[in-house]
From Swiss-Prot:
Cited function: Usually encoded in the trnK tRNA gene intron. Probably assists in splicing its own and other chloroplast group II introns.
UniProt-recorded name of the protein: Maturase K
Lineage: superkingdom: Eukaryota
Compartments (UniProt record): Plastid, Chloroplast
GO molecular function per UniProt: RNA binding
Amino acid sequence: MEEFKGYLQKGGLKQQHFLYPLLFKEYIYALAYDQGLNASTFNEPDDISGYDKKYSSLLVKRLIKRLYQQNSLIRSVNKDKQTRFVGHNKNFYYQMVSEGFAIVLEIPLSLRLVSSLKEKKDIPKYQNLRSIHSIFSFLEDKFPHLHYISDILLPYPVHLEKLIQILQCWIHDGPTLHLLRLFFHDYHNWSNCITTKKSSYGFSKENPSLYRFLYNSYVVEAESIFVFLRKSSSYLRSTSFGPLLERTHFYGKMKHIGVTRCNDFQKPLGLFKDPMMHYVRYQSKVLIASRGTYLLLKKWKSYFMNLWQCHFDFWSEPSRIHINQFPKFSFYFLGYLSSIEMTPSSIKSQMLENYFLIDTVTPKFQTIIAISPIIGSLARARFCNLSGNPISKPVWTDLSDSEIIDRFGRLCRNLSHYYSGSSKKQSLYRIKYILRLSCARTLARKHKTTVRTFLQKLGSEFFEEFFMEEEKVLSLMLSRTSNPLHQLYREPIWFLDIIRLNDLVNHL
């Protein structure tokens, strides 16, 4: 980042073509190479391909020149995406350049964000371009006190040029935007990527960084009205609501929010008259919960559609917005089946010498793991069958024992990490059991023995200590409780660090 900043400060910002020369810098592609190595996915590949060759400025120049020669090289042979020319796959050239291209696009936005933080200015709205979600914390505390929820699918742009216009507001660089148009024309069906899961999956796999950047730049515009409403109707007004949108500023937000007192509100009556609402998003799925009436939500629905179509030129349909009432409605979000559960309780009250038992009902936000999609994902990855019975993974038997255990352990920790927000842990225990027994069967198959014999030889404590590593770390964080491990399994713990697409969530 310091090299980028030094380059831009030497007059690069005053030039019209300040981004395009960065495409020929070798360290840009070295950075993309490191990101490719460090990225982890649910279906972890056995090897990392596509980045096995060194980059040079001469190679990049040749690749960009070949990309622009659409008529003679790319689109001349049957319009087949798997066509090979000059000994390479055409898609391979696009993947090489697009990864570095995405990093170059993020440079000016990252520098503006860093400068705004140092000067303590308001965070710009493009600060969450690297995140795939906008989640305001304490969701489990807000939802039980709200009455209605709107389930919304964000609209899609009517034309690819609309995405270029969005970026033109931030990046004044003609050659860079022309190169972006070239990528759009190659993936002519990218307009369906926002709503079509199949095409989105293919594009995101081939160009993950570019896909994330372009998609989130569009979503920032589409959700800007929701952020405005969230600011206007919130009860807790912290120093700045900008950091609430970005997962990297979560801990900074915790420092700003303190105990709210009545004297902190300048207009307490006006605040409490406003209908409180809560807003969360994952990819194109948006949830807006409100204390208002059903009629108010209907007005919001009409307002959103007109605003998107008339102001942003985003096409939206009434069927993409559904209004439901708590607590009758259960919804899928972030891989959880969430609902509001009414918990009965009794309160003992005393008036003079008389005692009374008052029955009351307390709403509680429940998050349950949707076990069926997870088992389906594990079955497709060959960890179990469709019934959830663990099986061995033959393709890993050629690896060393430590590598096999490390892969299973990493996957188990990732799932525990992701689904730690569940209020009921039984499904999470089942997932751990499937992975643990699948690991044992894989090792037993490698050594040509039975699972029982293998476990007796190594001891079951070895697996327990390995899979309990994360729980021990978290128990130290909760050491102030009398029984931290029990508290860990009983209460949900949320980790807001989702910065990429999650295959398990996409199956819902």
